């Protein structure tokens, strides 16, 4: 995929803000607690390797990714800290992880037994680092009974494993009603009752838990995800317990400016028709870049002023109404600040009837990433 350096459009990533968010989260944690920075999905669209490198300098203790391929890319880029693959990796690829000191998530007895057999057959000497996943109510992956978990604890004592962690994931930590959260927390306690010796990393807190439930959790590690990138995990549902600085901005420049006459229409389906003469700018950003097609009627910022998105967003371009004639090359902010005005990723998500996670992770590969700090 081409990173388009020759169009004046940047996804701007503020690494100082990223570090500030990590520091603010750390201030909320008990002394000695550790942070695993979640950099899966290209660091939520921000660029995995540059973001991880900045976070390593900021002192995070490790990283979480979704795929073994992502973990290998981090190792290849020089990242030496713990790297945990949160998804399930096929057993046949586990030797690659063992060779590079990459930690894998395990959620079944069958997987552990299959790897034991594979390690013996292939003569693998390097122990595989594993984190045992517990399904306390997310219903996704993990051991579902304390009995199976207890057997897993016995299996990971084998020489082919290095038992590094235990974790679960809360399904409703970003909601005001804590009933289901408390049910999951109690279920986690049931699992932990069979543990005779805790591994180095016990992590149950995601971004939402870190913002609103951290003091009720007995664990030594937090997985910091979307809050690290300056976005509220609940969207607009619950106010953050500490301030977050937005990390990601999307900035472009007008490629075409014209006067639209009354009665003339704009974009596919002719869904917008001018009621009077007005100035219109074409911007070189579209839904192929991750800006949602359904944003007609929303706005961008030009010179600190809200400028309405006219018609449907196209694959590569979009049109906005200007308050007056502006020259080609005028800056337009789709996410971020312009003078005293701001559009957050959550603002975009709310208008698009989705979540801020989807907007960030959907930022396209052809957007040129520009890093500050």
From Swiss-Prot:
**Signal peptide from the UniProt entry:** none
Q: Supply the source organism's classification.
A: Bacteria, Bacillati, Bacillota, Bacilli, Lactobacillales
One Pfam family name from the record? Answer: Ala_racemase_N
What the entry lists under InterPro entries is as follows: Ala_racemase, Ala_racemase/Decarboxylase_C, Ala_racemase_C, Ala_racemase_N, Ala_racemase_pyridoxalP-BS, PLP-binding_barrel
Residues engaged in binding substrate: 140, 315
Cellular compartments per GO CC: cytosol
CDD domains for this protein: PLPDE_III_AR (cd00430)
Under the heading Gene3D superfamilies, the entry gives: Alanine racemase, Lyase, Ornithine Decarboxylase, Chain A, domain 1
Q: What EC number(s) has UniProt assigned to this enzyme?
A: 5.1.1.1
Q: Which domain of life is it from?
A: Bacteria
Give the residues annotated as active site: 40, 268
Keywords linked to the UniProt accession: Isomerase, Pyridoxal phosphate
Q: What does this protein do?
A: Catalyzes the interconversion of L-alanine and D-alanine. May also act on other amino acids.
Record pathway = Amino-acid biosynthesis; D-alanine biosynthesis; D-alanine from L-alanine: step 1/1
Task: Identify which cofactors the protein needs according to its UniProt entry.
Answer: pyridoxal 5'-phosphate
Record protein name field:
Alanine racemase
Transmembrane spans: none
**Coiled coil, from the record:** none
NCBIfam families hit by this protein: alr
**GO molecular-function annotation terms?**
alanine racemase activity; pyridoxal phosphate binding
Can you state which reaction this protein catalyses?
L-alanine = D-alanine
Q: List N6-(pyridoxal phosphate)lysine occurrences by residue.
A: 40
**What is the main EC category here?**
isomerase
Q: Which family does it belong to?
A: Belongs to the alanine racemase family.
Organism, as annotated: Limosilactobacillus fermentum (strain NBRC 3956 / LMG 18251) (Lactobacillus fermentum)
Q: Name one GO biological process term.
A: peptidoglycan biosynthetic process
